């Protein structure tokens, strides 16, 4: 699509396949701020990514904040998913049930699966692995040149730097 084409242009020094990260989405370089022109490691005190559309999760996804956030970021890159499509078709889900074994509480893998259903008030949570899987599956189906990656544990200054470079991140 026309939206996709402009987002996939890269300089010769960039990799063919770009990186999209749950907690950071990367694409072509954007205009720099005054601070970053002078020092690539400088982070502005305040920065707003322009043309970033906010999408509400309610009423359709009462417990689907993570997948709604991913929808907003993918929209920013021109991939235009529907939040319900991402929640239904791409987000890995499992039942939320626990039991005790040898005195330990055992439950499902909340990092790689959404526990329950994000369309239900009884849905619970998912971790980065589930969002990365949903993002990469959707991106692959669209034949887009992005990859989701996990930046968990990185320094906050690195996250701020992504934002100051017009690269939205997802944090929860």
Each predicted region: which residue ranges?
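Active-site-adjacent structural segments surrounding the nucleophilic cysteine of cysteine proteases
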Residues: 1-128
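Generic surface-pattern signal
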Residues: 91-95, 140, 164
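Short helix-loop-beta junction
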Residues: 134-142
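Catalytic cysteine-centered active-site loop
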Residues: 141-153
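Active-site-adjacent substructure of cysteine-protease-like catalytic cores
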Residues: 151-172
């Amino acid at each position: 699509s026309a939206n996709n084409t402009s987002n996939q242009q890269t300089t010769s020094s960039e990799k063919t396949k770009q990186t999209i990260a749950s907690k950071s989405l990367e694409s072509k370089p954007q205009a720099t701020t005054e601070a970053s022109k002078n020092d690539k490691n400088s982070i502005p005190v305040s920065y707003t990514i322009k043309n970033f559309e906010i999408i509400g999760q309610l009423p359709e996804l009462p417990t689907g904040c993570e997948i709604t956030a991913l929808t907003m970021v993918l929209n920013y890159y021109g991939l235009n998913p529907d939040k319900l499509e991402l929640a239904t078709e791409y987000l890995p889900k499992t039942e939320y049930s626990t039991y005790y074994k040898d005195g330990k509480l055992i439950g499902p893998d909340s990092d790689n699966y959404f526990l329950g259903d994000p369309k239900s008030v009884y849905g619970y949570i998912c971790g980065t692995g589930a969002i990365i899987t949903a993002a990469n599956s959707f991106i692959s189906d669209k034949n887009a040149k992005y990859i989701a990656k996990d930046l968990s544990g990185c320094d906050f200054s690195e996250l701020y730097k992504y934002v100051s470079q017009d690269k939205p991140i997802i944090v929860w």
